[in-house]
Each structure stands twice: as C-alpha cells, then as structure tokens.
Amino acid sequence: MEQKNVRNFCIIAHVDHGKSTLADRLLEYTGAISEREKREQLLDTLDVERERGITVKMQAVRMFYKAKDGNTYKLHLIDTPGHVDFSYEVSRALAACEGALLLIDASQGIEAQTVANFWKAVEQDLVIIPVINKIDLPSADVDRVKKQIEEVLGLDPEEAILASAKEGIGIEEILEAIVNRIPPPKGDPQKPLKALIFDSYYDPYRGAVAFVRIFDGEVKPGDKIMLMSTGKEYEVTEVGAQTPKMTKFDKLSAGDVGYIAASIKDVRDIRIGDTITHAKNPTKEPVPGFQPAKPMVYAGIYPAEDTTYEELRDALEKYAINDAAIVYEPESSPALGMGFRVGFLGLLHMEIVQERLEREYGVKIITTAPNVIYRVKKKFTDEVIEVRNPMDFPDNAGLIEYVEEPFVLVTIITPKEYVGPIIQLCQEKRGIQKNMTYLDPNTVYLEYEMPLSEIIVDFHDKIKSISRGFASYDYEFIGYRPSDLIKLTVLINKKPVDALSFIVHADRAQKFARRVAEKLRETIPRQLFEVHIQVAKGGKVIASERIKPLRANVTAKCYGGDVTRKKKLLENQKEGKKRMKQFGKVQLPQEAFLSVLKVE
C-alpha cells in the first residue's frame, strides 16, 4: 500500500476518560476484530490493567478503513499509558505518530494529565483532534468542556468531535477525521533503515520483541540489524504487526508500525527510545530524544512468610525480562534478612510490580518505606555520593557540606471548593506555590514545586480524600535542590536497628521521632525485661519510650513474716531482670516495620 494512504495516530487522555473503550470500538468498526473476539479493554492484556482500569504496557494495532472518498487506508493505533510514572513511554509513543486523538470526558472536563499529555503532543508537532467522549452520560456538560478546550488548550472548540465510545456514537466521524486531518508519514524506503523502538515485551518463543515505527528504509527477515545505543548486532527472524493478533509479514517499510523479533535473549537490550538500523549500512543519525529509563523511587523488597530468598530472586529475574524499567541489587538487613533494593519509575509502578510479583509469580513479599535518591556532598572531598538507602546516609552531620533532594513540579486541577485544604496540604508538604488560575468559574489550576519525597508516601491518597476524588494531579521532575535533611536512627536497648533509619527534614525531625517511638511502643510485644526505644539524630537522643517488663509475682508464697524477706525476693528479681536486659534480644515483629511506614 502506498505511503500516502497510511495514518499513524495515538489516543491521549487522563486515566478513566474512556481511552481503551474507544480503541475497542475503532477495532470493531474497521473489522479488525470479529464478534467472537470481543471483550472489554481488548488492548489491556495484563490482569492488573483490567482490574485497575489503567493501561501500563503499550500496544500498537494495525487496521484498515475504507473511507468515504473510496480509498482504503492503513491505520496504526498506538495505545499509550496515561499515568505520570510512564511519561517517558508516552513521549516515545507520540514520537512514532503524526497525530493524536485528545480524549476528554464530557462530565469530568479537562484534568491534570490531559494537559500534561497535550503539551507533550504539541512539542512533537502532532496534529491534535479533540474528542469529547461519554456524551451519553446524564452528567455530561459539553458546552463547559468546549469552553475549556478553547481557554486551556487554545484549540478551536468547533473542531471537537462529540462521541460516546460505549454507545458507539461518533466512531465514523473520528475515523474520517483521522484520514482527513492527520498527514501521511514522510519517509524514504530507499534510505538506510531507521526505526524507533517505542515498546518491547518478552515472548517465550520469539525472545525479546521490539515494537517499532519505521522512519526510513525497510526491514525483512534475514537482515542484520544493529541497536544504536549499544552497538549490538542481531539477525531478524520475523517482522509483522498486531492486527490485534501477532501477524507475520514479508517486510516492514518506511511509515509502518509493527514488531521486529531477532531472537534477542534479554529485554534490557531493547531500550525504549533507541534506534534500530542495518548493521552493514547504518543510518547517520539516530531518532533524537533517547534516554535510558531512570528509577526515581527505591524500596527494599524482602521475602515474607514461607517465600525463600531464592524464590524471590527467580521471580524478580523473570519479571525484569518483561519490564526493562526496573533495576535491582541484592542487599541484606540484620532485621529482615536477605532481600533486594529495587528502583521504580514512581509509586504506581512500585505498586504494580508488587502486585504482579505476588500474583503472577506467587511470592509473598514485605516492602520497606519507599525513598528517593539523595545527593550528599562531603566536606574536604570533591565526591558527591548518591544515597539510595537511608542506612548509607552519613551519621555525622559535621562531615556533610550539603544534601540535595529531587524536586518536582506538581500541577493540580480541582473544583474550587477544595482549594483551601489542598493549598494547606501542599504547604505541609513543603510546597512552593508557582501559579494559581481559574480555568472556569468552578475549576482551579494550581502549580507547586515540592520535594519528590513528600509525594511518594501518601500525597495521592490525601489529595483524593480531601477532594472526594475530584481533584487530579500530575508531576514532572525539575532537578535537584539543596535541603536541610538529617538522618534519624532507631535504637532498641541501645542497639541501632538498620532497617529503621529515616531521612527527614530538620524542621520535622522532633515530631516525626516522637511518632515513630510511640508507634514502636504500641507494636513491639512486652518482654521479660524492660525495652528502651530511642530515636537519635547524629548520636543525640531526641525521643524515647519504654515498654515495661512482664514480671512474676515473687512474693506470693510469703505468708505474713518479715518485710525484709519480701524485699530480698524483689531485689533478686530486679537483679535478674538487669542481667536479662544486658543479654536479652528483642525480636521485632513485621508489624513494627509496617506501622512505621505510615508515620507522617
């Protein structure tokens, strides 16, 4: 088929605005799936995606549409994740398209991720077609959304297509708009091969498979290809496209979207954003914008209950084959035994990894408090160390010249009645207000700069509970900044517990330490000897609690008689408890670790 009849597009939307349903309808309308294959969220293949109603992995589907002008067009739909953790993947998917459908829920209006993804599409020079979805809902307010499209995004509201993916309204109009408004791909099949990888997955039979958009040249089985970021070479075994099923083709040429399999053993060799070219006749320039995946949040994952360290290691290895964004290294802790320090893209990514490990690989795990990467510059040296684990943070504050932590720009869109409490929350989280505007009389747009460490614990839950679920937010990394941070260590009977170290802001240290000590007092069971809980900052104790010992009634067998007899027995007991305290070990239950994660 000629290149002028090809269209590459993606759908961008906030979580839950009906993206996957619209994709299903387009596939049905163009006959890509038969009646028999219909099911909800056809492109969301992971269990987690279906249950949470979110898209994590991307898919790229080919379909054919006979337009009103009598020509048949080849359409490639690239489905993108909507969540902030996967923003780099979204940017690569947009780079593979010429146009985008911007989907907006008629009852919710424009939300934070709508705006964030809209600007990403504008940066890539895509043609944007606004679609107002869910117009069949009783709460739909189309005029309000049109006004927002004009005022917030600066698009012509009359160009917006009214649709309901669920009822199948407006689907033909959308397909006509894709054909008429989105330009065909430019590219020269005669030039050397240049293909952008925008997703990958692991197939037990084909090895690691790359989903690509071909910009120049063509590729067929038997070709020798090279990955430009690593210089590794492979021989192509199969090329094809998803028509939702994986379908083999003889070749892929300029303008096409499809997959390349080359019996690559490790999915990590296929990096999202990398460029594939021919080994013998490579292209001069790779596709711009490649970045290796960079974890923002780290946490310790340890085996729990009857899972062994080996089982956890095998599960992580298998999982990492499919998720190139995760990094992990072994670590051990006297309190929790052997485990791993794992890096994630963000909090949602972390939850999904935990859930998939437990569900798909059957391991039971315990996760320590998530933390970000701090940069510590020591005095008298030029070296800056990256601290991924609070245990590695230097104890002696006198040796530290400065500490930096990652900051993010948070954008929040909320109904106006919740503005007060949300501003208060952002101030508690050390946020600095940068902008506040009214999108319409009832909706407010806020911008804050705040530390990532404040967001990763409970910011999402708090914002949703304050606004009864109506507010939405999005954040992007803006760089490292100096902060007044200190390390707190928990001592139990004067012995430090490594897994209970925290890095907190100096202003909060006192309050935080007190809460930790109280929580531990509630969760550590009473022993036969007194337990002292202390929270120290640089060797100085700033909060402490004690758990009284259990004791037998040693004077029960004395009937009357001399008081000195009772005194002697009590003195003996006291001596025994003292010795016990010296040599006794306190076993910390798992609840003790978990309770401290929830401390504010």
UniProtKB/Swiss-Prot annotation:
This is Elongation factor 4. It comes from Aquifex aeolicus (strain VF5). GO terms for biological process: positive regulation of translation. It is a peripheral membrane protein. GO terms for cellular component: plasma membrane. Gene3D superfamilies: 3.30.70.240, Elongation factor 4, C-terminal domain, Elongation Factor G (Translational Gtpase), domain 3, P-loop containing nucleotide triphosphate hydrolases, Translation factors. Required for accurate and efficient protein synthesis under certain stress conditions. May act as a fidelity factor of the translation reaction, by catalyzing a one-codon backward translocation of tRNAs on improperly translocated ribosomes. Back-translocation proceeds from a post-translocation (POST) complex to a pre-translocation (PRE) complex, thus giving elongation factor G a second chance to translocate the tRNAs correctly. Binds to ribosomes in a GTP-dependent manner. Its EC number is 3.6.5.n1. InterPro entries: EF-4, EFG_III/V, EFG_V-like, EFTu-like_2, G_TR_CS, LepA_C_sf, LepA_CTD, LepA_IV. The gene is lepA. It catalyses: GTP + H2O = GDP + phosphate + H(+). It comes from the Bacteria. It is found in: Cell inner membrane. Residues 4-186 form the tr-type G domain. GTP binds at D16, H17, G18, K19, S20, T21, N133, K134, I135, D136. One of its GO terms (molecular function) is ribosome binding. Keywords: Cell inner membrane, Cell membrane, GTP-binding, Hydrolase, Membrane, Nucleotide-binding, Protein biosynthesis. Belongs to the TRAFAC class translation factor GTPase superfamily. Classic translation factor GTPase family. LepA subfamily.
